[in-house]
Amino acid sequence: MKTIRRLLALLLLAGAAQANDLRLTIIDLDADDLACGLRYTAIAGKVRDSMAIMKAREFEQSDHEMLVAIATVRRPADCASDVIVTVRKAVTLAGNEKFRTRDNRAYLELCRHGGIVVSPIKDHERDFLKQVERSVQVCFGQLTF
């Protein structure tokens, strides 16, 4: 049931993001998912592609670069999850610039490799995913912060 809810949330987010001409995919995996999500057949291809892109090239900080960020988010019980964030384009940010969601539940920041990390991801509720999507739009200048 939890997996089904995750997939539905991803589908809802994908639909909303396409409507705004922004593709945003968030795949959050439990720490014990050593296969990086490959056991979920619905997203296995996306995970493989994202990992291949991430390993194949170093990203330049460019306004028109597709970025795939893989980050580990530490959680209270020393639990970590792999987070894969794919965006269509990204803006160039200084290393210390951050964009917080309006409720401060998450923030976006530029990684060393030029990717965007979303942290922390505490749940998979639709409201949370919408907040992340809005933050990415703010980052791209599509919304005023």
Residue ranges and their predicted role:
Residues 2-4, 10, 17-50, 138-145:
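A structural "domain/chain start" motif
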Residues 99-145:
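C-terminal/domain-edge helix-coil "capping" segments
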Residues 29-32, 75, 107, 135:
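Secretory pathway export signals and precursors
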Residues 90-94, 107:
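Contiguous, structured surface segment used for ligand recognition
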Residues 45-59, 112-117, 121-122:
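Generic detector of solvent-exposed, compositionally biased contiguous segments
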Residues 34-45, 82-88, 99-104:
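Surface-exposed flexible segments
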Residues 52-53, 57-89:
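A short, hydrophobic beta-strand-centered structural micro-motif
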Residues 25-30, 69-71, 84-88, 111, ...:
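A structural detector for beta-sheet-dominated domains
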